[in-house]
Amino acid sequence: MSGIVVGIDGSAGSERALEWAASEARTRKLPLTLVSAWHAPSAAMAAGMAWGGVNPGDVSGELRTYATKRLDAVCSEHADELAGVEVMQSVVQDSAAPALIDAAEGADLLVVGTRGHGGFAGLLLGSVSQHCVHHSPCPIVVVPPPTG
């Protein structure tokens, strides 16, 4: 996949990353792929099956639907920033870091946000952004969260 890949999780940090990635995609005339990962914890799935009240397929379907609606909402909320950019959406059943690394294969750039901490904690990246920095198959930009 060529173009720019950006991770979206609904956080302020990922929305800031989306704004940066959209601007970069427009400037470089590249397509932009928004990736939202969802993951059904196996313990929760097992508990549901053990209690007999939850069908794992139903849980997976609901999580996928929620992730898709969340990604659609982010696109709507950022319609101005995304104007003039070819946008694709990808909803992936996986943990965030592996989903982003897979999506970035063949991409020109991977863009991720990071959590917002000040002081000493601010020197540390979140686990997803840190994993991506070390394993991305393409150049990566880690966008800091909004200040204030």
Predicted features and spans:
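Small/aliphatic-rich secondary-structure junction motif
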Residues: 2-54, 103
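Short glycine-/small-residue-rich Rossmann-like dinucleotide-binding loops
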Residues: 9, 75, 115
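A short acidic, glycine-rich active-site loop
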Residues: 53-70
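Structural beta-alpha unit
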Residues: 13, 27, 76-110, 147-148
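Glycine-rich, Arg-bearing micro-motifs that act as flexible, cationic patches
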Residues: 109-134, 145-148
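General small-molecule cofactor/ligand-binding pocket signal
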Residues: 33-35, 88-92, 141
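A short alpha->beta transition loop at the rim of the catalytic pocket in nucleotide-sugar-dependent
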Residues: 137
